[in-house]
Amino acid sequence: MRPAGRATADAVRSLVSAFADTLERRDWTAFGALLADDVVYELPQTRERIRGRARYVRFNAEYPGDWHVQPVLVLGDDPNGCLLFRWTLDGESMLAVAFFEVREAVIVKVTDLWPEPYEPPPGREHLVERA
């Protein structure tokens, strides 16, 4: 028997797939519906952390450039998911990975890892805290 609030591996994979799909379509309402109110987004390489659904949605909506997210591999095993994706920004492409924590059918934490260190783009200081 599955404890209350737990999801199946298929449900976690579906949630992670929907995350990538709604980002790519820029469907901010649907994207926000996948996130917990108190979602935490972390970028270890830039030492940035964003807390809360509204800030995380805005962070993505305001992200500069012509960017695209193409899933390569989606894994899920409650309460965790993983997305290997091709990130394309202004014509340049790279692989990256995101790890997800899921609780009660919503994403509560996202950690993005990139192949190279980088400095965050300017103009998002109002949304992030630096570690």
Question: Where are these predicted regions, by residue range?
Answer:
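Preference for short coil/turn "hinge" residues that link or interrupt alpha-helices
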Residues: 16, 27-28, 43, 100-103
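A beta-strand edge to alpha-helix "cap/lid" segment located at domain peripheries
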Residues: 2-7, 57-131
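Short, low-complexity N-terminal intrinsically disordered segments enriched in polar/charged residues
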Residues: 1-29, 33, 126-131
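A solvent-exposed, acidic/Ser-Thr-rich amphipathic alpha-helical stretch
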Residues: 29-78
